């Protein structure tokens, strides 16, 4: 996987793609700005590298437009941005109807459940937990229960309720909590 995080313009991406093809990356993530759907479509037709996007898309209507224009080969929605698990499941169903794989943006327990609940998802992203001062890692300070991969695979525990997370009281003293 190669991450561009919308850092390229269309012309630069068109120059880079032929140079990257020999490395056979699994996908190229967000090469151009998220709103440049025509640019995504042009790049997706230009290369053998699957183009992924959707991290900055917010509705299943937007994903339908991306799919109808054949703008992406891999959907990578952000569950928190699209409206949660229910909205993400609608996008998964849409992706299945277009035979497009879904690899939700970021790890975290809700995405693991979404990945395991649809044929459209061949894998989940996984980020090892390590201490940082700021960022999306706040999730890991607040909750316990994220699975540890074994030989590259994650198993979800069927014997725990809900998503399988519990509050991590060990770190609460680091936050201002109001009731």
Residue spans for each PLM region:
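Divalent metal-binding pocket/active-site signature
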Residues: 9
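Ligand/substrate-recognition segments at binding pockets and active sites
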Residues: 6
């Amino acid at each position: 996987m190669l991450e561009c995080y919308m850092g390229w313009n269309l012309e630069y991406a068109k120059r880079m793609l032929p140079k990257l093809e020999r490395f056979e990356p699994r996908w190229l993530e967000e090469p151009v700005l998220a709103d440049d759907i025509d640019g995504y479509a042009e790049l997706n037709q230009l290369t053998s590298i699957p183009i992924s996007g959707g991290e900055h898309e917010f509705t299943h209507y937007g994903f339908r437009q991306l799919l109808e224009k054949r703008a992406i080969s891999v959907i990578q929605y952000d569950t928190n941005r699209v409206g949660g698990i229910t909205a993400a499941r609608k996008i998964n169903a849409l992706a299945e109807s277009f035979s497009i794989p879904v690899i939700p943006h970021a790890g975290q327990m809700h995405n693991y459940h979404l990945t395991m609940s649809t044929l459209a998802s061949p894998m989940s992203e996984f980020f090892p937990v390590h201490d940082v001062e700021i960022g999306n890692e706040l999730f890991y300070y607040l909750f316990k229960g994220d699975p540890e991969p074994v030989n590259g695979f994650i198993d979800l525990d069927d014997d725990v309720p809900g998503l399988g997370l519990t509050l991590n009281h060990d770190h609460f003293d680091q936050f201002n909590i109001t009731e």
